[in-house]
Amino acid sequence: TQSPAEAAKLLLVRGQVKLDRNDHLAAVESAEELAGLKSSDEQSDTLQANAYNAACLLSLASAAAAKDEELAEAERTALVDKYAARAVALLIEDRSLGYFKDPAKVAHMKKDTDLDPLRERDDFKQFLKELEASATQPDEPASDE
């Protein structure tokens, strides 16, 4: 049996290979499996990294779907939005779990080309705005109860 970390690596590589072959549907399956990996012995940081990597795969899948000439235009548009919205949702989930408390992770995300397909989306812009606002706010002091 493989460890959850090994499974995560394999799912990420499989998703990337599927994208290289323009198979966005299979890449999305890998991304969803990656996002859903859970293990009681894994650190939450690893699980958050899985969700971040899944968001990257979904973002890239949205770009691949946009170029899929075999799909009708309406279906193509719907898939692009579905994949991209799911990618943003995973990033928001990661933020709520504390993944972006590390400024290095925020800096990486801001320049990560895997997320370029999301950058013009309103929900992604809102996510960035909220992330930057929370980064400038000091942690709330503990209450004296």
Regions found by a protein language model. Name each.
Residues 1-145:
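Alpha-helical protein-protein interaction modules
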